Amino acid sequence: MLVESWLARAARMRPHAIALRSAAAVLSYAELDEAATRAAWRLSALGVRPGERVALALPAGAAFAEALHGCLRLGAIAVPVDLRLAAAERAVRTERCAAVLDAPLEGAQDPGAALARHHDLDAVAIVVHTSGTTSAARPVALTYGNWLWSALGSAVALGLDPAERWLCALPLAHVGGLSILMRSAIYATTAVVHDGFDAQAVVEELDGAGATLVSVVPTMLVRLLDAGLRDPPALRAALVGGGPIAPALLERAAAAGVPTVATYGLTEACSQVTTGGPALFCTRLQIATGGEILVAGPTVAPGARAPDGWLHTGDLGALDDEGNLTVVGRVADTIITGGENVAPAEVEAVLASHPAIAEVAVHGAADEHWGERIVATVVLRPDATATARELAGYCGNRLARYKVPKVFRFVPELPKTHTGKLLRRDLED
């Protein structure tokens, strides 16, 4: 099935609406559409042909957006690359690319190049790499249909305002950040793009210019609240995802007048799967034997579907009678201690409610007697104190005895990815 290029449609329907705003540039849809055509001509002049991959090793901002839409206009496949990766990591992501863009596109153009004004929904648009929190990062080929259905599902779940201003401070090589650019183009609304996450800058943006949506991981929300975010005037929702969300954090946000929506998603499902509990209208959920979350629907990348048609997420969860999903953790993270299964997220949620704790991560370590012992790695709030005995007692009043950590480690910070997601595999045994 063919659909009109969403950027071309946005430029036709709302030429003067702001497509992108960054610290260095403001582009209307007419301007971004023209820039995408020039970028496509320049890519063609470099020898890039439809169906070939183009690595985008560019900072977040106008140059990235122009190159991204230039790839789509030419019919090439964009491959965003995180600039913070080591050279060897970048090489893995770019080895199959016909071109690597590490500077804004300039130079010769090929005005005779055939341009794509319509998209085949089954064609691959962008290859996004997973964050690699539990294993090596994997490439996921997302189609135009994946992006379109993801945008439609999100709009139904959140509502859509023509004056939407969606703030992105996530890396554009991450599906959560990239989806803001893609959805904004599909909706013909505004993407407000920050090059990196600076808590004070985001607070000022939310307090001043009035973004209506912002996407964050839990660590980012903590830092925004620490930086003084209170009652942002235009914010409809802070979408919080990318890892388990402690109820205490959502309560803290509510007390500060910050509306939050807990989300669950993954790269293979083109970002969002659930928003505020229920699945997107176009997405089906199932809990397999053992508790693994299975996902199906048009947002799931074709290459991520198992022979049974489902995406096996590797995440643990439960569905209530109304179809609301609660994510418990990762299948691989489950701790088996004394023959009992313990989900780290359950223990983390209890510890996160302790007033002295800023962040906590729980994992299992080999133990001759128990098989695995539960270890809690704790970051205390500034000027706060707590002892292992105190925290064990706190857990003992709220959890079954076998779920109480046997070891508490106090550290200045937790190991995380560039996007702020916990690297559980890097926790010390």
What are these regions (language model features)?
Residues 3, 8, 18-47, 52-55, ...:
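Conserved AMP-binding/adenylate-forming core of the ANL superfamily
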Residues 208-216, 220-221, 225-276, 284:
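Gly/Ser/Thr-rich phosphate-binding loop
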Residues 28-30, 125-152:
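Conserved AMP-binding A3 loop
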